[in-house]
Amino acid sequence: MREPAIVLQQLRRNVSESFCLGPLSLEIPRGAICALVGPNGAGKTSLLNILMGTGSVDAGRVSVLGHDVTQAAVEVKRRTALVSPDISYRAWGTIGRTINFVSGFYPDWDSQHCEQLLVRMGLHASERIDSLSFGGRIKLSLVLALARHAQLLLLDEPSLGLDPLARQQLFTELLAFMQDEERTIVISSHQLAELERYADYVAMLNQGQIVAHGTTPDLLSRYTELDVLLDRDGLIERSGLRLVARDGRRARVLVDRASMPPAGSGALGELQIISERNLTLEELLVALVKSNSGVRWRPRMGLS
């Protein structure tokens, strides 16, 4: 069995006085496209920075491609590439100068592949960085990452500012990158419909905690949503059930099949099931964020 690309063991990072990332424990398989999803402020960018070796760790252990990020940060950065709208290359003036500068740090830089990527992305070496659109800067960041032939590619909102055709091209390039089975991608994006199509592993973050993770098919089959009538006292205290929304006795309930008692045990009690449906990745994330497991619910919440 191959060593995982990423291993988090009780990782904790105090991002600010009011926000703590973790503790997180997670393994991301080598050769996977992992979707890192969650609402704004969940801790996704902070985690990506730690994986890149540019973010500090307050407790726990982080292994990337078999290296401890706190002890082998240089090696981690050499084998890992980050694509982010926050990276600025304006200081070098043009695309060509930027490429000349960045390529000098990487002995494995593939100049021919870089030229091919520029053509496919519609970029020219003579273009000035400050003339690029937001989407153009994302494309340049992707070119610089892919031309390195890194083993781990980290992407932070790479489809931001891209039109549908450019987003399709982005994923085409990512799939080409993944033809080498030793490579791994971790991608953070709010385009969950696209991630559901391409990602084979998902990690969901909320308020600095991992609320769900697993292969995409397993995660989507693990959860279902019920439209129910609550028992007379209107309380939910059953293992595997999370209240998503409520209006009087009627409620939407998220069911975690992995946490439910065995069939026939009467786990649903007096709940009267009106309907049941499977969830998309986006719907599952929203339901997990909105729900509150193991808490007695009394307030009314709209079902719309």
Question: Model segments located where?
Answer:
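A short, flexible loop at the N-terminus of ABC-type nucleotide-binding domains that lies
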Residues: M1-P23, R30, A35, A73
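Catalytic Walker B motif of ABC-type/P-loop ATPase nucleotide-binding domains
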Residues: L153-E157
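Helix-to-loop junction immediately C-terminal to a conserved catalytic motif
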Residues: M52
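Conserved ABC transporter NBD signature motif
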Residues: G60-Q71, V76
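The feature captures the beta-strand-to-loop junction immediately N-terminal to the Walker
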Residues: V37-P39
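Short, charged/small-residue-rich alpha-helical element at the C-terminal edge
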Residues: T224-G302
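ABC transporter nucleotide-binding domain
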Residues: F171-A258
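ABC-family P-loop ATPase nucleotide-binding domains
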Residues: S84-L140
